């Protein structure tokens, strides 16, 4: 399947209705790396009823116990760090679940949701995220339908994304993505999509944290003209004011990205898909294969 075809699957992924059965728990721990791990990052920002802790390493926190819902996410099912963390969680009697397309993780005896194979992990964000949303948030049918509609529209018209990609390419810019709650993880997702799809370095941060660090170099950093600032528009007046003032006092020009949708679910997936198409178009302009992750695979083999 070509990457352009993978993009077209996201709208159907938001209708993936699988969920886990959970018992009494007082915390959630989600383990995942790379394209699989981003689902946990996004979920942790939109769910606040119980503490959510993310694991992107071999080891798990000491507080994991029998009141922990532990979700291991690995698209391939063979991610070394995630398998190690899952084994540790099981030893500590956590309620371990898994989201995977197969591999070793699917054979470990955990409560497992099997998702379709044949995609890049980062192109499976709906399959990886929706089981978490369905289990712990339980979205309204109308919210899912709205997300489906917006994604369908983006599939048909992504000229804005193509235009931004052209500006970045023609100026040989380094993308800098700024978000704010509840889209901080989406800003990071864009950063990683620039990395993997377009094969360019990128940087992400979020308001208002960046006003306590990034603000200083924004005005006078060297090679300032090489950066291209992409900022998610916020309907929170506190963040909106910070964005406006930051742009003004640092003398930068922010390329504002509107967030379409009325429900949070629709907004999240709209921004995800916007970034997917933007980085896909940049990959095309650069003449690189957005599906190629050969260096990452080579690294895995070297350290195995």
UniProtKB/Swiss-Prot annotation:
Catalytic activity: alpha-D-glucose 6-phosphate = beta-D-fructose 6-phosphate; D-mannose 6-phosphate = D-fructose 6-phosphate
Binding site for D-fructose 6-phosphate: 35-36, 74, 76, 79, 122, 212, 300
Function statement: Dual specificity isomerase that catalyzes the isomerization of both glucose-6-phosphate and mannose-6-phosphate to fructose-6-phosphate.
Domain SIS per the UniProt entry, residue ranges: 16-147
Gene Ontology BP annotations: carbohydrate derivative metabolic process; carbohydrate metabolic process
Family indicated by similarity: Belongs to the PGI/PMI family.
InterPro entries found in the cross-reference section: Glu6P/Mann6P_isomerase_C, SIS_dom, SIS_dom_sf, SIS_PGI/PMI_1
A Pfam cross-reference name: bact-PGI_C
Keywords from the named record: Carbohydrate metabolism, Isomerase
Protein name according to UniProt: Bifunctional phosphoglucose/phosphomannose isomerase
Location of the active site: 196 (proton acceptor), 212 (proton donor), 300 (proton acceptor)
Record's subunit section: Homodimer.
Broad enzyme group: isomerase
EC number: 5.3.1.8, 5.3.1.9
Lineage of origin: Archaea, Methanobacteriati, Thermoplasmatota, Thermoplasmata, Thermoplasmatales
Gene Ontology MF annotations: carbohydrate derivative binding; glucose-6-phosphate isomerase activity; mannose-6-phosphate isomerase activity
